[in-house]
UniProtKB/Swiss-Prot annotation:
This is AVIToxin-VAR2. Residues 1-19 form the signal peptide. GO terms for molecular function: toxin activity. The lineage of its organism: Eukaryota, Metazoa, Chordata, Craniata, Vertebrata. It comes from Varanus varius. Expressed by the venom gland. Pfam families: Prokineticin. One of its GO terms (cellular component) is extracellular region. Belongs to the AVIT (prokineticin) family. InterPro entries: Prokineticin, Prokineticin_domain. Potent agonist for both PKR1/PROKR1 and PKR2/PROKR2. Potently contracts gastrointestinal (GI) smooth muscle. Disulfide bonds join C26-C38, C32-C50, C37-C78, C60-C86, C80-C96. It is found in: Secreted. Keywords: Disulfide bond, G-protein coupled receptor impairing toxin, Secreted, Signal, Toxin.
Amino acid sequence: MRSLLCAPLLLLLLSAGESAVITGACDKDLQCGEGMCCAVSLWIRSIRICTPLGSSGEDCHPLSHKVPFDGQRKHHTCPCLPNLVCGQTSPGKHKCLPEFKNVF
């Protein structure tokens, strides 16, 4: 009899558990807004989320495809904003930097 009284309480506790809702989940760049790409999540590698394009001084990956990219990205960073390039700052380290054009 006591177990019958505990069953509804147990169900109430189970249904009140915490859960996560992932916003901005995507598969391809075209599902994200302007100035964003669909990059691999830092926390859950099997999920891609809409991520802002790299700003000046932010980390980048030199092999990131331009936006929009029709396939699935393999990195957690987006390419740099259009007026920036992904330049090497030290061995194995790249950052979004201003694009210097040759004036000659």
